[in-house]
Amino acid sequence: GHLIEEMLLLLVRLSGHTVSHEQAQAEVEGIVGSMDCKIDGVLTDVKSTSSFGFKKFKDATLAFDDPFGYIDQIKGYAKSEGDTEVGWLAMDKQNGHLAFLKYDLEDTQAPVYEVLKEDIVERIKHVKAVVQQPEPPEFCNDPVPDGKSGNMKLPIGCSYCHFKRSCYPDLRTFLYSTGPRFLTEVANEPKVQEIT
């Protein structure tokens, strides 16, 4: 990811655009992070994605399906910087395609406004309160069917979560040609290697 980011920012500069604020620190409610950059003054996060994930940037549907929290992340940076225009420069790492998705957090006429309007400060306060609770929170997402096998698997966002085994202690991992698949229920044993 870091090499792709550096390559893309070099290409952005070579094409005549201005890149600034690289890895500038941002802070909101005690949460500190480093933004990727601003391109021509627009707060920008650089992403390398699979072909499947790339569609969300190309089709401008990220706001409606954001399992990795990219929206909240960039809203935090925007709050820290006092910006309202944000964007993602995404590269499909399988095909080399590029897309730039730009949202204006204050554009009340935009189709994504209802999804984007939640105040990031309130969101951060809520998450901090949830983390302080003695009991773990409800599951973020429910398992989904794994095709027609009768098995249930973690949704994409949960499959990357470091706490998936806390939520699902009996989780089983099977190694498919497309990568690991995390099954919460096994009705039919997959005919691929299980990772223990």
What residue spans do the PLM features occupy?
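Short connector loops/turns at beta-strand edges and beta->alpha or beta->beta junctions
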Residues: S48-F52, D92-N95
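The N-lobe alphaC helix and its flanking beta3-alphaC-beta4 segment of protein kinase-like domains
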Residues: I71-I74
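Generic beta-sheet signal
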Residues: E22, V46, L89-M91
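Metal-dependent nuclease catalytic cores that hydrolyze phosphodiester bonds in DNA/RNA
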Residues: G1-L43, S50-F64, F68, L183
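Short, functional N-terminal and low-complexity linear motifs
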Residues: G41-D45, G82-E85
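Metal-dependent nuclease catalytic regions and adjoining charged, substrate-binding loops involved
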Residues: F64, G76, S80-T196
